């Protein structure tokens, strides 16, 4: 069976319009995220330290749209520092205080301690279908208030899009 161009034109137009209507533009954001957490040692050798982290914090947006402002955050993961180079990763759940909607983020640390990248894996409510990501860099490190803990802030920059409903 041979399909004519005239027969396919309405279907193609419908598909393009449907896709264009559901697509969303990338939106940039930036924030300072401050958190406190616990460190659990897993291994320690001459040129190697491996530890797990469990942290909680708050996102302080500094972009004009105040994207993710006052979202609370919980992250877990593990990090290894081998001969001064860092590697590791984990996951974070961010909660919008106004709606309870969440985003789930996967983070990966870079070789330089305190830096890395992240990407959005999923979201609920207004964040359903979120995609995007960015990078982070340590902005402030303090002396731990208690042994086995840490407190710090990271500068976060990225972009995301959410399909229009």
Residue ranges of model-derived segments:
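Cleavable N-terminal signal peptides
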Residues: 11-13, 23
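Beta-strand-enriched cores of mature, soluble protein domains
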Residues: 24-165
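N-terminal signal peptide c-region/cleavage motif recognized by signal peptidases
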Residues: 17-20
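Bacterial N-terminal signal peptides that target proteins for export
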Residues: 1-10
